Amino acid sequence: MFKIKRQKSKASKLEWEEANDIRKHALEIVKTLDFSHINTQRLFFFRTSGSKSRAYARTWPFPKIFQRALGIEPAYVIEVLSEYFDKLDEDNQKKVLIHELLHIPKNFSGSLIPHIGRNRNLHRQANFFFEEYKKSKA
């Protein structure tokens, strides 16, 4: 009997591209919901394809140690994962963007707000702000 060697699947190629369409939607959300603590000049957007992650989107902070070492201001990157995010309808895409923007703290320090904390649930907050967003657009 022959033994069949299992071949490892080749890793898919991870690709990034600037996501100006996502930037436009996020800036509209920031303005509509008055998220004035967010410095939109230090907010960057990318669309990723080929990722193994099952998330719709992720928020990446620029770590404080790098900020100090390089002498630059805090910054955030919001990455949308094309395989999942692009399949969502427009309302759910906006809800995901609101969720990601809520990870950015009021002091825009380069840290992240976790999903659940004392007296806070980010998912509930995202749903609340999405409803507020929809009301203001009606």
Language model regions located:
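N-terminal low-structure segments adjacent to metalloprotease catalytic domains
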Residues: 1-21, 81
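Hydrophobic (often cysteine-bearing) scaffold residues that line and stabilize catalytic clefts
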Residues: 22, 93-94, 122
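Auxiliary, metal-adjacent structural segments of Zn-dependent hydrolase domains
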Residues: 24-70
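Active-site-adjacent structural patch at catalytic or cofactor/ligand-binding sites
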Residues: 63, 77-82
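Short, flexible turn/loop "capping" segments at secondary-structure junctions
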Residues: 71-77
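Short pre-active-site segment immediately N-terminal to the catalytic Zn-binding motif
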Residues: 80-96
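Active-site recognition of the HExxH zinc-binding catalytic motif
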Residues: 93-107
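Post-HExxH zinc-binding segment in Zn-dependent metallohydrolases
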Residues: 108-138
